[in-house]
Design a protein with these regions (language model features):
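FIC/Doc superfamily catalytic core
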Residues: 1-244, 248-307
Length: 307
C-alpha cells in the first residue's frame, strides 16, 4: 500500500485570504490603511487582495494567518468551513486516498508530539511493513498501533456516536499493544508525574470515578460543541488515566467527538507542540481561551486535509 502524501501540503477546504482579511477587519474594526500598515504592505496591495481577487504571496499569507489567529474567534471560521464541507466522516470512510493521508499525517504528528523520532516517510514504511533503519522497535510499534487505532476509530464512529468507557479503554489497548508494562486497556495503578504542569493529578484510586464523571458529561455538547470538545480534551488530560498514551488517546477521543458532530478531525501538528502544551497549562489556571483557539486551528488543518 502506498501513502504518497506530504506533511504540509494540505490544500483542501480552506478560507481564502480575502475571507480571512474580511474577518480580521470585522473583528478589529481597523481600516484598510491600518491593515496595510500592520502587514507592512501598501494600501494598493490590500485593495488588490480585497477587490481584485489577487492572492497574496506566501510570506504575506503567513502574516495574514498570524493576524487571523490572533484577532478572530476561530469558532466562527470553523463553523463556516463546516457549512462548506459535507460530512467529513463520510469522506474519510469512503475516499481511500484521503483516509490514508489522514491516518499517516495524524499518526506522524501525534506520535511526534509525544517524542517519536520517526519521520513521515519512516512512518509510511512502518505502515507498509518495510524495514526502518536507525529507529527503535518500540517507535515502529507506536506508528503501527496508532494507525490501527485510527482505523478502529473510523470503523466505529458514526454521526451522533456516544463515547463510552469501553471505547476509551479499547483505544488505549490498541495504542499500547506490545507495551504490556503500560497496562494496555487498563487504568494506571500508581502515580504519574508530568513536567509541564504544577496541577496535582488524581490518585490511581480516583481515576475510575473521575472517568465515570467524564463519561456522564462527554456526550452532552450544548449549543457550542467546539468549546465543549476543547474543554473535554483538557479534562481528560487532567485526569491522565493511564501510565502512558494519555495524549494520543485524548486526541483520538477529540477526533471521535468532532467527526460524530459533523466537523473535520483536529490535527495537532508537531510544529504546534509548544502552543498546544501552553494552552493546556493555561487551562490548568482556568483560562480556556487558548485551548479553544488551538482546537479550532487544528480542526482547520483537518479541513485542509479533506480536499
Amino acid at each position: 500500500m502506498s501513502y504518497d502524501i506530504g506533511v504540509t501540503k494540505m490544500t483542501g477546504f480552506t478560507l481564502s485570504a480575502r475571507e480571512k482579511i474580511k474577518k480580521i477587519m470585522a473583528a478589529t474594526s481597523i481600516s484598510r490603511s491600518e491593515l496595510a500598515r500592520r502587514l507592512e504592505v501598501t494600501y494598493k496591495t490590500v485593495y488588490r487582495w480585497l477587490d481584485q481577487g489577487i492572492e497574496p504571496h506566501l510570506a504575506q499569507s503567513r502574516d495574514i494567518d498570524q493576524l487571523f489567529k490572533e484577532y478572530v474567534d476561530l469558532r466562527d471560521a470553523v463553523l463556516e468551513l463546516k457549512k462548506k464541507t459535507k460530512d467529513p466522516l463520510k469522506i474519510l470512510k469512503s475516499n481511500k486516498k484521503i483516509k490514508d493521508k489522514f491516518i499517516l499525517n495524524m499518526t506522524y504528528h501525534s506520535n511526534a508530539i509525544e517524542g517519536s523520532r520517526m519521520t513521515i516517510k519512516e512512518t509510511e514504511k512502518a505502515f507498509q511493513g518495510k524495514k526502518v533503519n536507525d529507529k527503535e522497535l518500540f517507535e515502529i510499534f507506536e506508528a503501527v498501533n496508532h494507525k490501527n487505532a485510527l482505523e478502529f476509530l473510523l470503523d466505529n464512529t458514526t454521526s451522533g456516536f456516544k463515547i463510552t468507557e469501553n471505547y476509551i479503554l479499547k483505544l488505549h489497548e490498541i495504542i499500547m499493544y506490545n507495551f504490556n508494562n503500560k497496562l494496555p486497556g487498563k487504568y494506571r495503578t500508581g502515580s504519574v508525574n508530568l513536567t509541564n504542569t504544577d496541577i496535582a493529578l488524581p490518585s490511581s484510586q480516583d481515576v475510575p470515578l473521575r472517568i465515570g464523571k467524564f463519561i456522564k458529561k462527554v456526550n452532552n455538547y450544548g449549543s457550542d460543541a467546539i468549546t465543549k470538545i476543547a474543554h473535554d480534551h483538557y479534562e481528560f488530560e487532567a485526569i491522565h488515566p493511564f501510565f502512558d498514551g494519555n495524549g494520543r488517546v485524548g486526541r483520538l477521543i477529540m477526533i471521535t467527538q468532532l467527526l460524530s458532530k459533523g466537523f473535520a478531525p483536529a490535527i495537532v501538528q508537531i510544529n504546534d507542540r509548544y502552543k498546544y502544551y501552553t494552552s493546556l497549562s493555561k487551562a490548568d489556571l482556568g483560562d480556556y481561551r487558548n485551548i479553544v483557539q488551538m482546537t479550532c486551528e487544528s480542526i482547520m488543518k483537518g479541513y485542509e486535509l479533506l480536499g
